[in-house]
Each structure stands twice: as structure tokens, then as C-alpha cells.
């Protein structure tokens, strides 16, 4: 009888842990925990490029479980860490240009992780639609350099844009 109760308590504790209901711990379920592990990898790869594109001004961070709460996206929220001011803030405070750079970096980070994890999958082509109009000249140049490195890795990068300065910076283009 006591052995059965011990087993039942262990299973109950395991169930609470897997479902994010264990008292005194982070309130995320097992599925979210696994998603966070993959998301951390994507953010790590994204930050490699974001550092370059933001001129070493900021990186993205996954908010800690204790700061996420149940009203959020269950532990998958991002924040921005400023290397200039040594402070952390919500991603909603990013300017339009900064948001574009962060989104581009995340897309490239995801591509890196998919390629690394899937092995046989190698995205040979990437299209980026707009966003460059929200960048200042320096940020635009840094984004173009990062994309140029991708194109140098035997990938085709297509950019859909109305920004005149961007058209002048790209050697091969299709004008419609």
C-alpha cells in the first residue's frame, strides 16, 4: 500500500512538472520548455548577425521564465539587451528599422538552425519583401553586407523593394 502511494506521488509530481504546475518552480510546461531550448539556439544564431547589422548596439534575449507570467506567450517572449546602455527592454520598444533588423536576423537564425538540424535541407533561395525603407543608410549597408555574405555562400537572395538607394547597392537585379 505504501509503495503504491509513493509511486502515485511520484507520478503526480512528474505530471505537475511536465504540465508546468509544480509549486516553487517556473510555470512552463514540458512542451514550452523544449520550444525554449530550440528558440535559444535560433536567438544565438540571430544575434551573430544582429550584432553586425546593429553596429554592436543590441542583441535579443529570451525572457526568463520568472518574468514571463501566464499572460504571455507561455515563456517564448523576447527582450532587447542594449550593449550601449547595459539595459534590457521589451522588443515592442524597437524602432521600425530596428524591428526589421531583428526580424531579418531571426529569420536567418531560423534558417541556420533548420539547415543544421535537417542536414539535407539547404535553403538555396531567400526572398525579403520590403523593410529596407525603415533603415538609415548605415543600417541598410550593414544589412546588405550580411545578405551579401549569404549570397556568397551559394544562396540566392532576392530583395523586393522600392528604395532607390538599395537598387544602387545591388549588382545583379531584376527591375519590374
Predicted features by range, described:
Residues 1-4, 8-176:
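Terminal ABC-like ATPase head and other globular end-domains that cap long coiled-coil arms
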Amino acid at each position: 500500500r505504501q509503495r503504491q502511494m509513493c509511486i502515485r506521488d511520484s507520478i503526480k509530481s512528474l505530471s505537475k512538472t511536465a504540465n508546468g504546475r509544480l509549486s516553487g518552480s517556473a510555470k512552463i510546461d514540458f512542451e514550452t520548455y523544449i520550444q525554449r531550448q530550440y528558440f535559444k539556439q535560433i536567438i544565438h544564431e540571430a544575434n551573430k548577425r544582429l550584432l553586425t547589422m546593429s553596429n554592436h548596439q543590441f542583441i535579443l534575449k529570451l525572457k526568463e521564465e520568472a518574468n514571463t507570467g501566464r499572460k504571455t506567450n507561455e515563456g517564448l517572449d523576447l527582450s532587447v539587451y542594449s550593449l550601449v546602455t547595459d539595459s534590457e527592454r521589451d522588443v515592442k520598444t524597437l524602432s521600425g528599422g530596428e524591428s526589421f533588423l531583428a526580424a531579418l536576423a531571426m529569420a536567418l537564425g531560423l534558417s541556420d538552425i533548420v539547415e543544421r538540424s535537417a542536414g539535407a535541407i539547404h535553403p538555396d533561395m531567400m526572398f525579403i519583401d520590403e523593410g529596407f525603407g525603415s533603415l538609415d543608410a548605415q543600417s541598410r549597408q550593414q544589412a546588405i553586407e550580411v545578405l551579401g555574405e549569404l549570397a556568397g555562400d551559394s544562396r540566392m537572395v532576392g530583395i523586393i523593394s522600392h528604395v532607390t538607394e538599395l537598387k544602387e547597392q545591388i549588382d545583379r537585379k531584376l527591375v519590374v
